[in-house]
Amino acid sequence: KRIKNIDTQGIFVPGFSGISAPYWKPGFDDVYVELGSDPNQIIRAGMESIGFLFNDILNCFKSNGMKIPKTLTAAGGAGRPVLLQFISSLIDLEICYFDRKDRTAIGVYRILSGNHFKDESENRNRKSFKPKLLTYKNRKIAKWTETLINLNIKDNYSEM
């Protein structure tokens, strides 16, 4: 709720415990690009960094020939509407959120296997996040990528 209506031009790269997939870089200092001292903008940029990493992981899948389903599922800790809407808009895919505690394994199974079996119980208590136009999307992805390249986290010639 706190950052629902907050916009930021800045980028935050969380480094305290390192950066995870697809880069696997061990700990480094957090990086703030074009972020001032407004805590809400820093929180928003931190949330967006999760979306950018998710986008980079999907791009790895695509560059390795994996087909991404039209709808992704999320649950558990990912159940933050602002985050799920941002990711949906960033990757141009619908994301369905189920209120069951942990559906991570089923989501991974569906992505990797392409098996989209239907379980009618899944349709209960489901929220759907459809992509919305992000006017700044390409600019922010480019800034994220440039920041990772400047930090020697991402290869300049990588297809991700």
Feature-to-residue mapping (PLM):
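Glycine/Thr-rich phosphate-binding loops that ligate phosphate moieties of nucleotide
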Residues: 1-160
